[in-house]
């Protein structure tokens, strides 16, 4: 059995662009929780936003915070009510804790739980550290065919799955996706897995378009080619860019669905355009029940995640990982909390 230390190393955000390494106590699992030794943690745009701005909307970093919520690892200890046979199993973590008692939770919409505790959302610590705790049923077993990196990236894959579910993507659909970054690429793969026959990714970056094409999407340069005649059944915005959202709405056929995944605060919405064409405009907020679907998509090979990883860093390089996320040559950046430094973080050119 693995000997568990009393303290661990954590990368802690104390304020805007103020990261330090600290020794923290190793958390002790409650009766319904497991203790996970962290293997891989993906860097998300929200981590970058907290690092650069210290807040996202109403969530403010006003006390020290550990970032990171895309997590995989290995169970090393369990609470009193958890089967000890789980110790040693590799897992992917759904990084949230709903109350399980409110109307939303009882209806199955636990992502909307007003009491939600979500990794790396103030004041809840995340996973840029050696160990984390999570309720037993939110630590999903993964087979050896799924790597630690891919298991961590089941979190952004869950975003893509939730977008496809909310859009109601079905066999034969045409799907337009704005943005060829990680979420756009993942959403394109999920759309194909859900049966879409024409998946179009629009991005102004030639490098991102080339990458999206390598994953089987049809690509367009929205600055040079109109998509209005595409008449998509479903439009998914993964760009957060106002012009892309406006164009995507115009490119959605009557009765179609617009799913907002990107982070634009506001955009002009033509109410007559929506009302007279009976468009369904919706958003997604995280996900519910997506990890088993994500695992099945990875095991079947319908979705590939390992090739999205472009950079890998150690715990001493979290600031470097956060500073480089979002650049054109970067798709997914991974932090290995139990490694101090990686000499050559770039593992593949995203081109």
Would you name each region that the model predicts?
Residues 1-10, 246, 288, 292-351:
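C-terminal hydrophobic helical "lid"/dimerization subdomain
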Residues 27-41, 56-103, 143-145:
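Glycine-rich beta-strand-centered segment in the early N-terminal region that forms part
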Residues 97-178:
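NAD(P)H dinucleotide-binding glycine-rich loop of Rossmann-like/cofactor-binding domains
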Residues 144-224:
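Mid-domain Rossmann-like dinucleotide-binding core that forms the NAD(H)/NADP(H) cofactor-binding site
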Residues 167, 210-280, 342-344:
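Glycine-rich cofactor phosphate-binding loops and adjacent beta1-alpha1 units
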